[in-house]
Amino acid sequence: MKNVTLVLSDGTKFHGKSFGYDAPVAGEVVFNTAMMGYPESLTDPSYAGQLMTLTYPLVGNYGVPPFTFGDDKLPLFMESDKIYASAIIVADYSEEYSHWNACESLAEWLKREHVPGVTGIDTRQLTKVLREHGVMMGKIIFDDEPNNIPEADYEGVNFVDKVSCKEIIKYNEGAGKKVVLVDCGVKANIIRCLVNRGVEVIRVPWNYDYTDMEFDGLFLANGPGDPDMCQDAVDVIRRQMNNSRKPICGIC
């Protein structure tokens, strides 16, 4: 494992070791307090462009499940079809793993998807810093390449456009009530929960104009990045609210 340093935008440094893909990276440093579910969190489109810190101390001990897709073409054990987080930061990475459904280690998965991973970080202290100062930009720098400093400029970047579907996708077609789901970075399990409730889900791109479509309810998914970049979606929602009394549900 190579020595690395996490440098926050205020100059605070945390030292650790690389266990994923060996490449420097920069991005927003955020934290996640879940005790399990790192495969789901890493594939959550909401984490696009972010360095995800896990506060739970031991990570990797149950490996990574396979990318298996159901009849609805949704991944069974992930929230999307790839890792969206730019990096993962943990306190203690377990090289050994055991789970009936595991097919590879977390490190193997990260390397295959070209995603850096850092272990040996005091993640709870890091979380305290983030809690006090809010989301901060950070850089993961390899100590043997001190001049290879990554940069991340999010000015004008529309992460929602990067993660949203590009065409209409229908699930449970012909089931009954129709729900239009605006994909700003929807997780697979949100779609699955809607389908399990016996509705037809019509998944549309984040900026799609659905106001002339026939449907019974509107569902707004959450997603990554700055919501100010999603003015097109806001305009369509406003038109829908002005012209119809159909129910609207938002989720975070």
Sequence positions of predicted segments:
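RNA-binding accessory domains that recognize and position tRNA/RNA substrates
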Residues: 1-208, 227, 235
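Short, histidine-centered active-site or binding-site loop motifs used for metal coordination
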Residues: 92, 221-222
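Generic beta-strand/beta-sheet core signal
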Residues: 182, 204, 220-221, 251
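Short acidic/histidine-rich motifs immediately flanking catalytic phosphotransfer sites
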Residues: 213-218
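Cysteine-nucleophile active-site neighborhood
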Residues: 222-252
